[in-house]
Amino acid sequence: ANNTVSIAQAQFEPKAWFRGIYADETPVGFIMLFDDPDEPVYFLWRLLVGAEFQGMGYGRQAIAHLVDYVKSRPNATELKVSHVPELPGNPGPFYQKLGFEYTGEDDDGELVMRLKL
C-alpha cells in the first residue's frame, strides 16, 4: 500500500504506531507498527522509502529506531515483518542484513520474518 492508504489505515486502527521518515526537512518515507503492549510479538506493518531515497540508509536507520522503540515496550520479545517475494524490490535481503530470519510461515502468500529482541 502507498503512504496515503497507510496513513488512512493508521487513522482507523487504534494500535497503529506510525511516523514519517525525514532527511532534514525532506520526507523520504513512512514506517508503521502494529503496537499492542499486551502481546510479546510486534509487527512491522509498513516500511516505505521513496525509490529515489533507497540505498541511502534511511530504511536501515528507521528500523534501528523502531527496534529501540519496540524493545522499550512491555513484554516485547520479537518483531515480525512479512513480504511478497515475487514483487519487484523484494525486501527480504534488506531485512536479513538487519538480523531478521525467515520463520517458515507463509501468511497468505507473504513470507514471515522475525527479529528476536
Label the model's feature ranges.
Residues G50-M56, P85-L87:
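Active-site acidic-Proline motif in GNAT/NAT acetyltransferases
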Residues V70-V84:
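Conserved GNAT acetyl-CoA-binding A-motif
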Residues A1-W45, G50-E52, Y69, R73, ...:
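Acetyl-CoA-dependent GNAT
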Residues Y95-E105:
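Conserved acetyl-CoA-binding loop of GNAT-fold acetyltransferases
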Residues L66, V70, L98:
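Conserved alpha-helical elements of the SDR catalytic core
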Residues R114-L117:
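Short beta-strand-to-coil "C-cap" segments at the C-terminal boundary of structured domains/repeats
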